[in-house]
A protein has these predicted regions:
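Glycine-rich beta-strand-centered segment in the early N-terminal region that forms part
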Residues: 1-46, 161
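A structural motif shared across PLP-dependent enzymes of the aminotransferase-like
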Residues: 44-56
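Mid-domain Rossmann-like dinucleotide-binding core that forms the NAD(H)/NADP(H) cofactor-binding site
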Residues: 72-142
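Glycine-rich phosphate-binding loop and adjacent beta-alpha segment
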Residues: 161, 165-236, 269
C-alpha cells in the first residue's frame, strides 16, 4: 500500500475498490502519521489490486485484534453507520430503527447503536433475523410480514439504508423530536441510485417535524479512531459472509448483487 498526497494523472479505466487494509510499502514526502511497515486500514483507491494508493487522512492504524481480512471489512460501511447515527443525534436510552439491518452498513449500525446504549430494532428478511439478533438487535422485523412504518410504534431515530419506504410513513413512525437519516438512494442503498427521496427529506424538514435528513458520508481517519476503540473493546466486530481471492473479484461482486449477503464480502490478496 502506498500512501500519497495527490496525483495529476489517473488511468482511463480505474481499478475498483475503496476499503483497504494492508501494510505500508511507501509513503509520500509529506506523510507524518505512518512509516513503511505499519499495518493500516481505511479508504483508498484501486483496492482490487496487489498495491493501492491512499491519502494519509483516510487511513488509521489497524485494530490490534483484527486480521487484515477483518479490518478490510470495516472502513466504508462502519464509518457510514457511525456518521449516520451521529447525524441522527443518537443518545443512550433511545429507540433506534435500522432499516436494512443485515447489510454492511446496517450490521454496523446495529452494533454501534447498541454500544451507545440504544434499544435497537432491525428490519430485514426472515432469513436474516437470527443474524441481526446475533449483532445485538433487541427486536427484529420481517419486512415481508410486519408493517414497520405504520405509526403503531415510534422511534427516536430511524436509519434508513434500504431506501424504499415513503417519507410520509417514516414520519409517522418518529417521535416528535426524533430524526430520520437516509443513507443512500432508492436503489438498494446505493448512494448514487435514486436521489429524489434523499433530496426531498431535508427540504421537508424545513417546514415539518420531526427532523428528516440525508447522509453525505465522508471518509476521514477521525471516524476510524472511535471505531477502533469499539472494536478493540469487543463491542463491534466485522461480519464476513465470504472471502474471495483477487482473481475471483467478479464472483464476489455477483454475490453482493444477489442481495443475499449477511454483512460483508472481502477480497484477499
Amino acid at each position: 500500500m502506498r500512501i500519497m498526497g495527490f496525483g495529476l494523472r489517473s488511468p482511463k479505466n480505474r481499478v475498483p475498490g475503496r476499503a483497504v487494509a494492508g501494510t505500508v510499502v511507501a509513503v509520500g514526502a509529506g506523510v507524518t502519521r505512518f512509516t513503511v511497515g505499519d499495518a493500516v486500514f481505511g479508504a483508498g483507491r484501486g483496492a482490487f489490486a496487489e498495491y493501492a494508493a491512499a491519502r494519509e487522512d483516510r487511513l488509521a492504524h489497524k485494530p490490534s485484534n483484527l486480521t487484515f481480512e477483518q479490518a478490510a471489512a470495516v472502513p466504508i460501511s462502519a464509518t457510514t453507520a457511525l456518521q449516520g447515527l451521529r447525524l441522527g443525534r443518537i443518545e443512550a436510552g433511545q429507540s433506534v430503527l435500522v432499516i436494512g439491518a443485515s447489510g454492511g452498513v446496517g450490521g454496523y449500525a446495529v452494533q454501534i447503536a447498541k454500544a451507545y446504549g440504544a434499544n435497537v430494532t432491525g428490519v430485514c428478511s426472515a432469513a436474516k433475523t437470527d443474524f441481526v439478533r446475533s449483532l445485538g438487535a433487541d427486536r427484529t422485523i420481517d419486512y415481508a410480514v410486519e408493517a414497520f412504518a405504520d405509526g403503531s410504534r415510534r422511534y427516536d431515530l430511524i436509519l434508513d439504508i434500504a431506501g424504499n419506504t415513503a417519507l410520509r410513513r417514516l414520519r409517522r413512525s418518529l417521535e416528535p423530536t426524533g430524526s430520520l437519516v437516509i443513507v443512500g438512494g432508492e436503489s438498494k442503498g446505493n448512494v448514487t441510485g435514486g436521489l429524489g427521496r434523499s433530496l426531498r427529506a431535508p427540504l421537508m424538514s424545513l417546514f415539518v417535524r420531526p427532523r428528516l435528513t440525508m447522509l453525505a458520508s465522508k471518509e476521514h481517519h477521525a471516524d476510524l479512531a472511535p471505531l477502533t476503540e469499539l472494536i478493540e473493546a469487543g463491542k463491534v466486530s466485522p461480519s464476513i459472509e465470504a472471502t474471495y481471492p483477487l482473481d475471483r473479484a467478479a464472483d464476489a461482486m455477483r454475490q453482493l448483487e444477489a442481495g443475499t449477503v449477511r454483512g460483508k464480502v472481502v477480497i484477499t490478496i
